[in-house]
């Protein structure tokens, strides 16, 4: 049970038919709406380590919409792969630091292995160095947006206020980013 990934592969390879599949709840879905935005959130039960079934349920429950944004955890783990599977565009968010660049390279390799289109957003773009930009240039990866560090963004989030509502200039940055995503056919990003 603890090692199960929910893929059914063990049943396929067990010639004796000794393995059976059963339903084990791993989490739940919460649905919500704010003005024109519908939200589906998957919550993993405490003590459960396997989130891909919850992610699949979120994707299945997501409304048919012109734009579907799936926010994944960072990294290249199974939950990330399940989150990006089938995406029209994978938007990788990074920071221009050595750690950020290392993680970006791993994520780019994963997305390329899945043969999915990708682009990059550089967060806190005014810190660090230019190596992230150089990597993207050398790999022909579009940088759709660079967002400089702004303490007011963190302060707004700490109050539960989205940056785009607290700061009009952030709203313009995100609106411009959305236009770029949509122009690339990113209906399922």
Locate each region found by the language model:
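Iron-sulfur cluster-binding cysteine motifs and their immediate structural context
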Residues: 1, 5, 9-25
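Conserved active-site and cofactor/substrate-binding residues in soluble primary-metabolism enzymes
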Residues: 5, 46-53, 102, 165, ...
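Conserved Radical SAM active-site core
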Residues: 6, 25-38
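Switch II (G3) loop of P-loop NTPases
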Residues: 41-46, 50, 57-80
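Loop/turn-to-beta-strand initiation segments
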Residues: 64-68, 89, 117
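Inter-motif core of Ras-like GTPase G domains
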Residues: 77-98, 104
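C-terminal lobe/tail of nucleotide-utilizing enzymes
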Residues: 110-189
């Amino acid at each position: 049970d603890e090692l199960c990934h929910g893929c059914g592969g063990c049943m396929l390879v067990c010639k004796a038919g000794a393995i059976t599949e059963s339903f084990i709840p791993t989490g739940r879905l919460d649905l919500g709406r704010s003005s024109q935005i519908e939200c589906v959130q998957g919550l993993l039960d405490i003590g459960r380590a396997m989130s891909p079934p919850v992610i699949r349920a979120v994707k299945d429950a997501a409304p048919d919409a012109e734009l579907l944004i799936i926010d994944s955890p960072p990294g290249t783990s199974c939950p990330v792969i399940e989150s990006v599977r089938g995406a029209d565009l994978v938007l990788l968010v990074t920071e221009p630091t050595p750690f950020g660049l290392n993680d970006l390279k791993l994520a780019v390799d994963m997305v390329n292995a899945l043969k999915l289109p990708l682009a990059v957003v550089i967060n806190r773009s005014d810190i660090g160095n230019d190596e992230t930009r150089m990597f993207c240039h050398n790999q022909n990866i579009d940088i759709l947006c660079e967002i400089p560090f702004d303490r007011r963004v963190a302060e707004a989030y700490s109050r539960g206020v989205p940056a785009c509502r607290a700061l009009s200039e952030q709203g313009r940055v995100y609106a411009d980013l959305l236009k770029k995503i949509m122009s690339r056919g990113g209906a399922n990003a």
